[in-house]
């Protein structure tokens, strides 16, 4: 009760200071009625705030009985509870912990929000008809031979950049403390992890380097993450052990120095220690899944001192071994969801790391789960690949109740795996689905790879841009693409609510697609390869290409 009373004191003071004089100046109400109005208004504010921060119940479903898991708490002095009664500082203001990514001027983690729903869609005027290249930034290339080949530069899967519009006080601090700023440092900045092992910082407007690159040595395949409190922490996952060990990295942008490195986890149930997942901050904690089958919960230390391990969760189904996590944790309130390489969807309570349910979706889940909240209930969208099924199988695209794991609907889409030379290409879903907006608010979009490909086709690695009805799971339309598509689609809405989609494929073709019909409005080869996912601001987007390019495009 003491925490609750502390929480509401600032709200009460703000209301009295700001709204009290407005009511008293009216001159038509008695002091008693005025006091009642103030009390009613404060109660309404408190009720709305409580609805926003109320935690979901930690109800353990029967499916947990089919799991083996281990929870180890390393920090016994710090409560693991996501305490929404606490506030943190953001840009000099108190900000409630339940909304660190909401209303922000930027994309700080993969797909922009904790729901992984790319909610900040772009804005355009009229009907778009072309895509223009605005600038190109060149990365280094590193062709050092590793056990998994060479990786070059540019960015790969998922490789989404970070976009931030820094407040003036943060810019001033950087200018006072950072030795890495260039003459092109500006308020709007792009950050992207590269396959060459560097993190690059780019002026959004000019495409020039805004800081010196930060070297993490090992290739970065996944999407980096900027702390949403804008404290200067940048979180980077290494994906290939060019130099062992690889692990999780935290960089302090105020000093341009590394403040944390996890290294090799000898307690993990899997030896492969890559981190393609884009970490997410919830409250005072950072959650970071690994391909070693472990979910890490870190306490974010004050004053940019890095991270301290709080709790780890290792889990697997009773039947089948442990599997890694390549997708990014999807979060609503205190629930977190992720998929594994052996096809299981897990739900955990972020307070305790206790598993609450699991669902078997049959095959490898690399695409990140997307959450849609309807009347307070979270619903999940998830799809798998054709990997363990053999040469042919189905992409099982499902909608689940996020509270219980119950199946709302599923659609089994036939796909094939292709072997070409020494390489194989799994069918199914790699890209993270996109929730429609505007006139497409009943649809969800996904790039489904190799629905009907075979090795004798002249263009065997094709994909289909697929629209699925969110209510029924039925396919509304399919638009064929000539090459496989791992890049996640992004949306743009115009002044009349018409929804349009930008997506790319592995041959470097860029597409503008009318969301309602699937009609291609524009297509052109615009780079070497699209595997990375874009970040969108207004009518512009930035996305990387394998090779050496980070490119900004404008939708006209």
Where are these regions (language model features)?
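Hydrophobic membrane-insertion alpha-helices, especially the h-region
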Residues: 11-19
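Bacterial signal peptide processing site
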Residues: 26-28
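Bacterial N-terminal signal peptides that target proteins for export
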Residues: 2-10
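Intrinsically disordered, low-complexity linkers and terminal tails enriched in Pro/Gly
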Residues: 30-33
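Extracytoplasmic/lumenal domain signature
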Residues: 35-96, 102, 117-157, 162-276, ...
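Short polar catalytic/cofactor-binding loops
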Residues: 111-115
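Short glycine/Trp-rich loop-beta-loop segment that forms part of the substrate-binding cleft
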Residues: 107
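C-terminal motif of bacterial Sec signal peptides marking the signal peptidase cleavage site
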Residues: 21-24
């Amino acid at each position: 009760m003491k925490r609750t009373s502390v929480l509401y004191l600032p709200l009460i003071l703000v209301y009295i200071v700001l709204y009290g004089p407005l009511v008293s100046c009216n001159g038509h109400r008695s002091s008693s009625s005025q006091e009642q109005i103030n009390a009613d208004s404060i109660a309404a504010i408190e009720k709305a705030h409580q609805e926003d921060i109320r935690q979901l119940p930690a109800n353990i479903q029967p499916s947990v009985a089919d799991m083996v898991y281990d929870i180890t708490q390393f920090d016994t002095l710090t409560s693991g509870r996501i305490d929404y009664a606490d506030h943190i500082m953001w840009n000099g203001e108190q900000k409630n912990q339940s909304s660190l990514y909401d209303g922000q001027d930027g994309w700080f983690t993969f797909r922009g929000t904790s729901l992984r729903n790319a909610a900040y869609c772009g804005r355009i005027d009229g009907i778009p008809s072309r895509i223009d290249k605005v600038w190109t930034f060149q990365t280094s290339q590193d062709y050092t031979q590793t056990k998994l080949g060479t990786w070059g530069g540019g960015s790969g899967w998922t490789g989404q950049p970070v976009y931030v519009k820094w407040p003036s006080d943060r810019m001033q601090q950087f200018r006072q403390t950072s030795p890495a700023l260039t003459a092109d440092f500006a308020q709007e900045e792009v950050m992207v992890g590269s396959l060459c092992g560097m993190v690059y910082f780019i002026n959004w407007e000019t495409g020039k380097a805004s800081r010196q690159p930060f070297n993490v040595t090992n290739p970065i395949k996944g999407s980096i993450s900027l702390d949403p409190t804008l404290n200067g922490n940048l979180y980077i996952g290494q994906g290939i052990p060019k130099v062992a060990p690889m692990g999780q990295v935290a960089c302090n942008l105020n000093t341009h120095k590394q403040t944390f490195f996890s290294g090799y986890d000898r307690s993990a149930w899997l030896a492969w220690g890559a981190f393609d997942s884009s970490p997410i901050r919830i409250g005072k904690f950072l959650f970071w899944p690994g391909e070693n089958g472990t979910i890490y919960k870190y306490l974010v230390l004050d004053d940019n001192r890095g991270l301290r391990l709080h709790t780890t969760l290792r889990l697997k189904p009773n039947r089948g071994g442990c599997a890694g996590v390549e997708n990014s944790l999807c979060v609503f309130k205190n629930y977190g969801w992720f998929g594994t390489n052996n096809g299981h969807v897990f739900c955990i309570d972020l307070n305790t790391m206790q598993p609450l349910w699991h669902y078997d979706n049959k095959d490898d889940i690399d695409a990140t789960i997307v959450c849609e909240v309807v009347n307070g209930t979270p619903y999940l969208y998830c799809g798998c690949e054709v990997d363990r099924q053999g040469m042919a199988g189905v992409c099982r695209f499902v909608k689940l109740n996020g509270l219980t794991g119950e199946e709302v609907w599923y659609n089994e889409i036939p796909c094939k795996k292709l072997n070409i030379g020494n390489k194989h290409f799994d069918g199914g879903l790699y890209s993270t689905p996109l929730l429609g907006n505007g006139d497409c608010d009943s649809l969800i979009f996904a790039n489904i790879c190799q629905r009907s490909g075979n090795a004798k086709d002249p263009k065997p690695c094709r994909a289909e841009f697929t629209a699925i009805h969110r209510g029924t799971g039925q396919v509304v339309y399919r638009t064929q693409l000539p090459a496989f598509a791992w890049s996640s689609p992004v949306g743009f809405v115009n002044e009349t609510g018409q929804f349009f989609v930008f997506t790319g494929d592995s041959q470097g073709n860029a597409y503008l697609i009318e969301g309602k019909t699937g009609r291609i409005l524009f297509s052109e080869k615009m780079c070497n390869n699209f595997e990375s996912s874009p970040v969108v601001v207004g009518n512009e987007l930035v996305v990387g290409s394998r090779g050496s390019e980070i490119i900004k495009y404008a939708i006209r």
